[in-house]
Structures are given as C-alpha cells and as structure tokens.
Amino acid sequence: MARRPPPYAWLGPGVVLGGLLPTVFLLWDALSGGLGANPVKQATHQTGQLALIVLTLSLACTPARVWLGWTWAARIRKALGLLAAFYAVLHFGIYLRGQDFSLGRIWEDVTERPFITSGFAALLLLLPLVLTSGKGSVRRLGFARWTLLHRLVYLAAALGALHYWWGVKKDHSGPLLAVLVLAALGLARLKTPARLNRPARQ
C-alpha cells in the first residue's frame, strides 16, 4: 500500500516556485528596458528588498505556528530561508556587476562604507545557514548546536535591515517598518518555549 504524502507536502516546492517568479519579472524588465536609466542600481535595490522581505517571512513562520496554530507555516520556513539566501546572493552578484567585478573597488567598499559592510556581513552569516539547512546537519551537529548556529539568522536580518536603512537617503518608512517587524519577531521568538522550536519534518 503506497504511503500517503504528509499534509501540506506541496507547500515547500510551491513556495520555491512562486518565490522565484520575481526573478522572471526582473529578467523581463532588464531585457525590455523596464529598469530605467540605471538598471544595475534598480535591480540591486529590488533583489535586496526581496531578500529582506522573504527572510522576514521565514522568521515569522515559528511565531505563526506557535501563537496562531498555523502548523503549515513550519513546512515553508526552510524554503523561505533558502529563497532569501538566493536573493541575497543575487543582490550581491548584481552589485559586483555594477562594480565591474573590480576586487579593489569591492574591497574598498566593504572596508570603508558601513552600508556595504553591513550587507556583506549579513550575506556571510546566511551562507553557513544554507550549508547546514538539511536534516543531516541537525543530526551531525546535534539539535542544540544546530539551533545556536541558526539563531544567527536574526543577526543577519538585523544587519540586512541596517543595510537597507543606510541605503535609503530620504524616505526611511520602509526600513523603519522592517526594523519594527523584525523586533516584534525577535520578541516573539524569545517568548517561544525551546521545545517548540524544533525543525518541522519536511
């Protein structure tokens, strides 16, 4: 007798497919001239905002499961986290293109411009989380150490919000909203019992 798939098994793949749609629209805009006079700058902004939005949604999954009873939210947390990392890498890649892949200019930016430093640090923090996102990593590291490592996502999100704030010159309503939402999610996480933070079965 064939095993029935677990409830909401389609959610993870569905989130990934849906979450990749903005890249299709971005590519279309790039090819059709829809990104304006400075397409690299516009694409950099769009992918950076997408990375922070999707990362924030991933952080909302545990509070949604614990406090609202939305058990399905746990099944999309990993997919959202990987999507956020994808957009962060894409954001950085477009920035590199804007710098003509000049290592000297990039190093100068990273070491002398806090705006770039914060974004680069956020990206570096996300990479080990991606590499240890599988169930095998939980077994190898042990749940306690794995959990401690993956709490770095909150620091990465905070640095991403700071990067966003410093990157906006006039209207800070968007960065301010990001900071407030992340602060609320961090507080919700602190009030979540540790036993309820285990990764959901995929």
Swiss-Prot record:
What's in the keyword line of the UniProt record? Cell membrane, Electron transport, Flavoprotein, FMN, Heme, Iron, Membrane, Metal-binding, Transmembrane, Transmembrane helix, Transport
GO cellular component annotations, sorted alphabetically?
A: plasma membrane
Q: How is the cofactor bound?
A: Binds 1 FMN per subunit. Binds 1 heme b (iron(II)-protoporphyrin IX) group per subunit.
The residue range of the signal peptide is none
Transmembrane residues, as ranges? 8-28, 50-70, 76-96, 114-134, 148-168, 174-194
An example molecular function term from Gene Ontology annotations = metal ion binding
**Which locations, inside or outside the cell, does it occupy?**
Cell membrane
Please classify the protein's predominant subcellular localization into one broad category. membrane
Q: How does it sit in the membrane?
A: Multi-pass membrane protein
The record, for InterPro entries, names:
Fe3_Rdtase_TM_dom (IPR013130), MsrQ-like (IPR022837)
Checking Pfam families in the record gives: Ferric_reduct
Q: Name one GO biological process term.
A: protein repair
Q: Does the keyword Hydrolase apply?
A: no
Listed cofactors = FMN; heme b
- Keyword match Zinc: no
Q: How does it assemble?
A: Heterodimer of a catalytic subunit (MsrP) and a heme-binding subunit (MsrQ).
Q: Which family does it belong to?
A: Belongs to the MsrQ family.
Task: Please explain the role this protein plays, according to its UniProt record.
Answer: Part of the MsrPQ system that repairs oxidized cell envelope proteins containing methionine sulfoxide residues (Met-O), using respiratory chain electrons. Thus protects these proteins from oxidative-stress damage caused by reactive species of oxygen and chlorine. MsrPQ is essential for the maintenance of envelope integrity under bleach stress, rescuing a wide series of structurally unrelated cell envelope proteins from methionine oxidation. MsrQ provides electrons for reduction to the reductase catalytic subunit MsrP, using the quinone pool of the respiratory chain.
Name of this protein = Protein-methionine-sulfoxide reductase heme-binding subunit MsrQ
Q: Which organism is it from?
A: Deinococcus radiodurans (strain ATCC 13939 / DSM 20539 / JCM 16871 / CCUG 27074 / LMG 4051 / NBRC 15346 / NCIMB 9279 / VKM B-1422 / R1)
